From Swiss-Prot:
Changing residue 215 to A/E: Abolishes enzyme activity. Residues 29-138, 214-328 form the CMP/dCMP-type deaminase domain. This is DNA dC->dU-editing enzyme APOBEC-3G. Changing residue 259 to A: Loss of cytidine deaminase activity and significant decrease in antiviral activity. Signal peptide: none annotated. It is an enzyme of class 3 (hydrolase). Changing residue 259 to A: Loss of cytidine deaminase activity and significant decrease in antiviral activity.
Amino acid sequence: MKPHFRNTVERMYRDTFSYNFYNRPILSRRNTVWLCYEVKTKGPSRPPLDAKIFRGQVYSELKYHPEMRFFHWFSKWRKLHRDQEYEVTWYISWSPCTKCTRDMATFLAEDPKVTLTIFVARLYYFWDPDYQEALRSLCQKRDGPRATMKIMNYDEFQHCWSKFVYSQRELFEPWNNLPKYYILLHIMLGEILRHSMDPPTFTFNFNNEPWVRGRHETYLCYEVERMHNDTWVLLNQRRGFLCNQAPHKHGFLEGRHAELCFLDVIPFWKLDLDQDYRVTCFTSWSPCFSCAQEMAKFISKNKHVSLCIFTARIYDDQGRCQEGLRTLAEAGAKISIMTYSEFKHCWDTFVDHQGCPFQPWDGLDEHSQDLSGRLRAILQNQEN
């Protein structure tokens, strides 16, 4: 027997979906929250649960929020199937509010047989410290099952369009800047949840052998400091990592380099123009010519921000890439090669090392010395 569904709809109209799931990070007048859900069961016996939609208002009483409506319904279902394990997936226009987030964490802590994956179109009050802490509490895994939260990318929007929209068999047409907004929100969520890189990803991509092969991605780790009483103070909430977006991934037809993704997110930090900041980047490859030009423009226009770049390897250090690095240095950026100290710092700060110390690879120091000499020659405009 199924419990009765209340306050649900089967599908939404196309304009309703496009309006409410539009993923620009800062939006007004989107006060209705749409929650599309799917419930799957583990094991050979799978009760036929239908995917449906809850909706509610942002500023209404908590019990009318779609997240709470879902759990009210789901709790009734659980009473009929206490021994079953469930995988619940949400696709939601706004991430849950602080109170909903805390109640969700309590529910999941009390029912370890339920796992919840949340795909969000936008982040609600992502700048609020209390909200950030609530999200971390919901998504942390150390003390037992919790939720997994991700930003909706093209694939999730396409899935919702096919599953929850009266699409009349028309294909999903992404709006302008969908992939760019996805990257911005992905980076901001990573900052909030303090995502860490897995050790193999770090050691593979940051290996500093000068002529290494098969490293086609650029990883960029970053941290931000603010000057206070003549001392640089680390801003823990402004720390994270990202990588370039390959062509045809997450809706990027032409791809987007890590440095440009990083520049996209800085305006959302809302750095105080009357304060001095130092941004430090640790990159697996040095910037290409175009990215170096854009980074130079940024620091030229933002005099309150200084930029330090430590790179593991030099990308195509012939021709225009050399010119780009010189332009970036002339604009005021400090460019250096990563040494053991920087590799260890990245390992300790950005990697989920599980308490294991950083183990340098063979040739690390020799490669750093060689690359440092080549970088000096490039910046001094000397022939190799």
